[in-house]
């Protein structure tokens, strides 16, 4: 029996078969590793790669394209460069380097790519923001007008910081720079400020100690720690501050307040210098690349106080699509960059750069630190250029002459060493100055509420401590505040609620202080 094959049947069967066939092929833009070493890879191909784009190397090593040259791409590796070898295939990912953001990041310790390293499981968040983003333009900003209290008397009285400000903490190693930053973070408890601590090039043990301190004071509830330790590759140390800024921008653009501490930017500059030299970029002063100023300025300009107008805020330049539906006005991002100086040399390249970018600096001096003045702030060259507008009225009133009084005291102190015959006025000035220095001393991790600071500084500047012996000033301060809490809590409450020191409140405070000085001196003599 012969079967005839009809051509139309064959073609219809083939058509059906072809219609059901789906192409599984994926198209990748790939390149080849020409050379690898010191955390840098030269890749041939990838002609469509973008600057800052993530690249996928074998063995799950990620990299980022930094140098886009005529015949190759210079990429930095975020993983172990021994895992990558010559001839390996590199894939473009098509996405720019980004970091996960959101409330789920609070209380966690992560690396600069947002990968948790605290052993508390994965971070549940869908929103990712790019590491690099243009700073908000002038029309989207508002001038700094709200205070960000550090809890440190010397800073809140003479070098006030406002929300949205950039205040540099600068000093030699071991002068208490990190302690000032941590005190500020601890003092934000209950104030609705989210904190980000970025550790760059620190020892792993130091970071563990910082996390431990924050946990002990209940500060990790509203804090994220982003860390690239000294043993991490230089590219991770280079991008760590940008990851901190991206997370801070999430809170800023959703109408909340954030504080980011970069500890410290000297190490980031060193990591960037290392990458730039390995990528054969031309060196400049101190062998740093020519754009090291731009590295820090584009980072610190992202700290801002955003306008209250939501409609204007929604039109913000470079606003990522993921954030657009959540935008609220009135948020702020405050930056506290830290810079380490060598032997107090603030005129070196990186310190002068960052001083010129920021809105003021807190200068910590090793001589003051060693003489027992802690925090070791040199009031003479420390300044806050915009914080004055954010200071509460009460503090402005009581601390108005404090800086001048201290400056005069330092000058007289230097002269008094040469002569013993001092007139009455000079002696009185020296005595008061010594007491002012004493009341500005403060222990580590014991930030003080602003109303208590106002009460103590009021006593110092009004001369109410002149009858208390210098060595007893700290004890007097403790006991006086305890007495205020017990018998005159309404005075502190009034300052806290109104932010001002009314004449009647000041009168009652003065009266209470005068009575207490007599009682205290009698007790000391006894």
Swiss-Prot record:
<dbReference type="InterPro" id="IPR036121">
    <property type="entry name" value="ATPase_F1/V1/A1_a/bsu_N_sf"/>
</dbReference>
<keyword id="KW-0997">Cell inner membrane</keyword>
<keyword id="KW-0406">Ion transport</keyword>
<dbReference type="InterPro" id="IPR005294">
    <property type="entry name" value="ATP_synth_F1_asu"/>
</dbReference>
<dbReference type="GO" id="GO:0046933">
    <property type="term" value="F:proton-transporting ATP synthase activity, rotational mechanism"/>
</dbReference>
<dbReference type="InterPro" id="IPR038376">
    <property type="entry name" value="ATP_synth_asu_C_sf"/>
</dbReference>
<dbReference type="GO" id="GO:0005886">
    <property type="term" value="C:plasma membrane"/>
</dbReference>
<keyword id="KW-1278">Translocase</keyword>
<dbReference type="GO" id="GO:0043531">
    <property type="term" value="F:ADP binding"/>
</dbReference>
<dbReference type="GO" id="GO:0005524">
    <property type="term" value="F:ATP binding"/>
</dbReference>
<feature type="site" description="Required for activity">
    <location>
        <position position="382"/>
    </location>
</feature>
<protein>
    <recommendedName>
        <fullName>ATP synthase subunit alpha 2</fullName>
        <ecNumber>7.1.2.2</ecNumber>
    </recommendedName>
</protein>
<dbReference type="InterPro" id="IPR023366">
    <property type="entry name" value="ATP_synth_asu-like_sf"/>
</dbReference>
<keyword id="KW-0067">ATP-binding</keyword>
<keyword id="KW-0547">Nucleotide-binding</keyword>
<feature type="binding site">
    <location>
        <begin position="171"/>
        <end position="178"/>
    </location>
    <ligand>
        <name>ATP</name>
    </ligand>
</feature>
<keyword id="KW-0066">ATP synthesis</keyword>
<keyword id="KW-0472">Membrane</keyword>
<comment type="subunit">
    <text>F-type ATPases have 2 components, CF(1) - the catalytic core - and CF(0) - the membrane proton channel. CF(1) has five subunits: alpha(3), beta(3), gamma(1), delta(1), epsilon(1). CF(0) has four main subunits: a(1), b(1), b'(1) and c(9-12).</text>
</comment>
<dbReference type="InterPro" id="IPR000793">
    <property type="entry name" value="ATP_synth_asu_C"/>
</dbReference>
<dbReference type="InterPro" id="IPR027417">
    <property type="entry name" value="P-loop_NTPase"/>
</dbReference>
<keyword id="KW-1003">Cell membrane</keyword>
<comment type="function">
    <text>Produces ATP from ADP in the presence of a proton gradient across the membrane. The alpha chain is a regulatory subunit.</text>
</comment>
<dbReference type="InterPro" id="IPR020003">
    <property type="entry name" value="ATPase_a/bsu_AS"/>
</dbReference>
<dbReference type="InterPro" id="IPR004100">
    <property type="entry name" value="ATPase_F1/V1/A1_a/bsu_N"/>
</dbReference>
<comment type="similarity">
    <text>Belongs to the ATPase alpha/beta chains family.</text>
</comment>
<dbReference type="Pfam" id="PF00006">
    <property type="entry name" value="ATP-synt_ab"/>
</dbReference>
<dbReference type="InterPro" id="IPR033732">
    <property type="entry name" value="ATP_synth_F1_a_nt-bd_dom"/>
</dbReference>
<dbReference type="InterPro" id="IPR000194">
    <property type="entry name" value="ATPase_F1/V1/A1_a/bsu_nucl-bd"/>
</dbReference>
<dbReference type="Pfam" id="PF02874">
    <property type="entry name" value="ATP-synt_ab_N"/>
</dbReference>
<dbReference type="GO" id="GO:0045259">
    <property type="term" value="C:proton-transporting ATP synthase complex"/>
</dbReference>
<keyword id="KW-0375">Hydrogen ion transport</keyword>
<dbReference type="Pfam" id="PF00306">
    <property type="entry name" value="ATP-synt_ab_C"/>
</dbReference>
<keyword id="KW-0139">CF(1)</keyword>
<keyword id="KW-0813">Transport</keyword>
